[in-house]
Amino acid sequence: QIHNSGLKTLLLSNNDTPRIERFLENIDSPYIADADKPKPDGYYKALEMLGVKKEEAVFVGDQVFTDICGANKVGMANILVKFLQYQSETKIGKKRTLEKYILKFYKMKKKYHHRIGDIFNERN
């Protein structure tokens, strides 16, 4: 439905190709594997592949330290979404805890609070 509305999508991931292809079984979208986010190269490559300018793009991600920081480096608008947590991913869980404290700090400081939302709210 997204593509029917004229929007373009691309999956920019630090995962390898076999893992990404499992996610894309039902999604018709190009991808960039091993993107090395938050380095900007992958973001620029994504813009080039989609044929859009950074001002025309919005990056959607679930990790502050990779997705959002990388998009900010490139100057791309971005949206932080609530993440799915799997018990087997303890390394990511530790990073998420740190992200949670940073986001709470930003909300307390009222800096960018209008952009952060409440992604840690348990209600869906």
Locations of regions flagged by a protein language model:
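Asp-based, Mg2+/Mn2+-dependent phosphohydrolase catalytic module
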Residues: 1-124
